[in-house]
Regions:
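Blade-edge beta-strand/turn elements of extracellular beta-propeller
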Residues: 31-42, 83-97, 139-152, 213-223
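Gly/Ser/Thr/Pro-enriched helix-cap/hinge segments flanking short amphipathic alpha-helices
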Residues: 199-202, 209-354
Length: 354
């Protein structure tokens, strides 16, 4: 058993147990799955908590990124035939700017600075800030956490679920993170839940993007008024009104639905479908140009912590520039589509573009 200085039992730290290998399961197409972990090259024990799929090196092939608890993260680069190798260290995604492995929990992914490249954010344990890895292109990333305003506001919190989404419908990606300790601390004056969980309670955070990839805490939304032990976090337009709502789970409490009450002027929800399977084309990328501003949104990919978000692509803008819409499908082909009428839910089907 593990106890703190006061003799009270605590949850064991990751260094006190062995990790196990992650699993890659292939869908047999009949409702069953088979493990291809060993033949895919993924049979390496670790303490994985967060995972996402996306094209990390820009070669058109899906890769896997794993946030590990207390050891270097893994960037499994795909070879296009279900084989992978870990390139996290050379890509700049394994450790932070100080050369330290951190207690990785959840992952958020998206283009935070509008340069057309998908960046990564990983949440961590208290005393470790969340880490923002900026995509430099050609498979290289750098830790820009401090420069983008995330170091100081996150270092005193334990982050789990996280999501990059356009919370205020201005065309750039904002950041939300759910918090809850794993070690007892001083009890927050507004802590909810039972007496057992109150010393673990923390406020969640919503950060607004200034359009250049720098973040500040939103103090006006009332989002931080709930203080609990948050874990899972997912986003989606639950009421189909054109903005992204949030769902958060707690270790000791009911599920919470945060209804987005912003009033977007122009918005779109896009289902991105491959008719050959009649399914969402996971790994596809939607590029929306509005004047000189680019919104790049990937389809699906996972992330956060033990959560799955709405797979529809959400676009919003306050601009009135010339607009264009393009989809790069997961097989590497591309099509242009007419921009649907704004304030609508539409479907983009492969083969029906230009």
């Amino acid at each position: 058993s593990v106890t703190n200085r006061g003799g009270l039992p605590e949850y064991p730290a990751p260094g006190q147990f062995k990790g196990s290998q992650d699993q890659l399961l292939r869908n047999n197409g009949d409702g069953s799955f088979v493990s291809i972990t060993i033949e895919a090259g993924l049979a390496r024990p670790s303490r994985g908590l967060g995972v996402m799929a996306g094209d990390l090196d820009g070669d058109g092939v899906l890769d896997l990124y794993v946030a590990n608890d207390g050891e270097p993260n893994q960037a499994w680069i795909g070879d296009g035939s279900a084989g992978f190798h870990d390139a996290a260290m050379e890509m700049g995604l394994a450790i932070n700017i100080f050369g330290q492995a951190e207690a990785g929990m959840g992952i958020a992914h998206g283009d935070v600075d509008g340069d057309g490249l998908e960046d990564l954010i990983v949440t961590h344990l208290i005393s470790e800030s969340d880490t923002l890895y900026r995509n430099l292109g050609q498979g290289h990333f750098e830790d820009v956490t401090g420069a983008r305003g995330l170091a100081h506001p996150t270092i005193d919190f334990t982050g789990f679920g996280t999501l990059l989404f356009d919370g205020d419908n201005d065309g750039d990606l904002d950041l939300v993170t759910s918090h809850g300790r794993v070690l007892r601390g001083s009890t927050h004056a507004m802590a909810a839940g039972s007496s057992h969980w109150q010393p673990y309670a923390e406020e969640d955070h919503l950060f607004l993007n200034d359009g250049q990839g720098r973040f500040r805490i939103d103090a006006k939304s009332g989002f931080a008024t709930r203080v609990g032990v948050s874990r899972g976090l997912a986003g989606g337009d639950l009421d189909n009104d054109g903005d992204i709502d949030l769902v958060i789970t707690e270790a000791d409490g009911s599920l919470r639905w945060w209804k987005n009450q912003s009033e977007p002027s122009s918005w779109w929800l896009l289902n991105v479908i491959d008719p050959s399977s009649n399914r969402t084309d996971l790994g596809a990328v939607v590029e929306f140009h509005d004047g000189d501003k680019l919104q790049r949104r990937s389809v699906g990919g996972g992330g956060s912590y033990l959560s799955g978000s709405d797979q529809r692509v959400h676009l919003a803008t306050r601009n009135e520039g010339e607009r264009s819409l393009k989809v790069r499908w997961s097989d590497g082909t591309s099509e242009s589509f007419q921009v649907p009428p704004h304030r609508t839910i539409s479907t983009l089907r492969k083969g029906q573009g230009e």
